[in-house]
Amino acid sequence: MNIHRLLQNVKYTGNPGDFDTDFVTDDSRKVRAGCVFVRSKGGSFDGHTFAEKAVEIGAKLIVAERDTGVENQILVENSRQAYALMCGNLFDNPAKKLKMIGITGTNGKTTSAFLIKDLLQQMGKQVGLMGTVQNMIGSQIIPAKFTTPQPYELNALLSQMYKSGCEYAVMETSSQALAQNRLYGIKFDVGVFTNLTQDHLDYHKTMENYFDAKCLLFQNSEKIVVNYDDPYGKKVAERFKDKEVITFSDRDNTADYTARNIEYSSKNVKFLMVAKGSINRVDFPMPGEYSVHNAMGAALALIALGFDETDVCTALNHVHGVKGRCEILVKEPFTVICDYAHTDDGLKNVLSSIRPFVKGRFIVLFGCAGERDSAKRILMAHAVADYADYVFLTSDNPRGENPQSIIDSVSGYFDEKKVPYTAEVDRRKAINSALNMLQYNDTLILCGKGHEDYQVLNGITVYLDEHDIVKKFMDNYNKEN
């Protein structure tokens, strides 16, 4: 691609020259002969220190925010924004050829993304997906390294989707990705807001910064679907009142769509989705109060795209579950559930939904992530103590922190509340201990890992798949019983 085409819509000063290139990167480890290297700032490494080395390797052009001292450079105001635009140009801006749906929020992004993909496929559409669990092009599964990929990988994936015949792309958009301008230049047909609770404050520092990062999605969305029951959802609706905002609620009749006559069970939730001039019955095959919000948000994303309301609500009755999201691994003689809940709000949502249907003891296994927002740990303990009969305190991803210290930071709360617990640093051992404790009609929920099949311990990623652990236990259990 000619450099001037690569730089289309990028505002810069300097002379880029006139040459062709097939690669642009902001990763110093990927610099190669003939490429364009974008020097970005972030984290512990400043790409601005690497310019001379990149030219020695063979980079044709350096894109930077300040003078690097090398001859072949251009200067931009924001290198991350420039990089995102260049990556889009390199792949011929595939986002412009697709109907783009973005989902953001603390909880519910993954479930919402899979629901929207499922609903679109029921409408006969070819759909691509990017998210925490996996990326997908139709039925093809591509492993996901990030909730939202870096600009080069993101545009490469969107290009693959388009070339494979996809008409729609459904994306989870993380707050970090939005703040880092990974999605800069991409316009969304619909943006969906699920909720906002304390998370990622190690990165954003304040809830206001966290909220502002989420709102970057809606600045670039033509239509916005908002959970009006969330306080921050009301702020989204107010901030973007000049756009087409569609609100939903299970309690506020001022919302555009409300859920009424809600009936909960251990297997599903039934409700009427009511709007001005329409009533549609929904029999949604996933349990829990939060499932009402997930179902309505997904349905309204399609309705915002112009699909028939009745057709969409009918399709909601036939959607499939998502791996690691309130996923039932064992149904009898006891119940074992796997869920990704890793925030206090996520834990409260899933535990409060399951608790009413537990016939025996409710046993909760969870841990708190290391090197992440430590203030939320005690809030997670509060949520668990409110619902559990017995708790297994274990490790999540300790990373470089001492896992025992993480456990010790919350164990005192269970002592104070007189909630019995076992503390076990080794998550595999903790899971097996919890499984061996189960009696008839008990329910065990494994919280925090969900779809993940690994742990990060001291900077090393080790294999740990809770699905496999439970399967091996049940294979032995069934042989002996």
PLM region spans:
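Acidic, Mg2+-coordinating active-site environments of NTP-dependent enzymes
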Residues: H4-R5, A64-V70, F188-V336, S411-P420
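ATP-dependent carboxylate-amine ligase
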Residues: M1-Y12, A33-V36, G42, E244, ...
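Short, well-ordered alpha-helix to beta-strand connector turns
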Residues: T21, A33-G34, A59, V70-E71, ...
